[in-house]
Amino acid sequence: MASVNIHCPRCQSAQVYRHGQNPKGHDRFRCRDCHRVFQLTYTYEARKPGIKELITEMAFNGAGVRDTARTLKIGINTVIRTLKNSRQSE
C-alpha cells in the first residue's frame, strides 16, 4: 500500500490522522497541532459557474427551494440566499 504525505492546509503540519468519512464517503483528516478537520477532495458546488443563473431560472419556472437544492446538489440556505440577493440587486 502506498503512503501519502498529508499536510494540514492551515498550519502545514504533518501530524495528521484520519478522522472518519463525509456522507459521500471521502476521507476526513484532523490535524494534531491546530485541531482543524479537513478533506483532500472537497468541492463547493455553489461556487461553480452558472449556478446562480440556474437557481433563478428554476425559481421562475416554478421549482421549489427544496427541489432546486436537491437537483443542483447544493444547500437549501444557499438557494434562499441567492434568491434574496438577486432580488435586492434588481
UniProtKB/Swiss-Prot annotation:
InterPro entries: InsA_HTH_dom, InsA_N_dom_Znf, IS1_transposase_InsA. Signal peptide: none annotated. GO terms for biological process: DNA transposition. Keywords: DNA recombination, Transposable element, Transposition. Absolutely required for transposition of IS1. Belongs to the IS1 elements InsA family. This is Insertion element iso-IS1N protein InsA. It comes from Shigella dysenteriae. The lineage of its organism: Bacteria, Pseudomonadati, Pseudomonadota, Gammaproteobacteria, Enterobacterales.
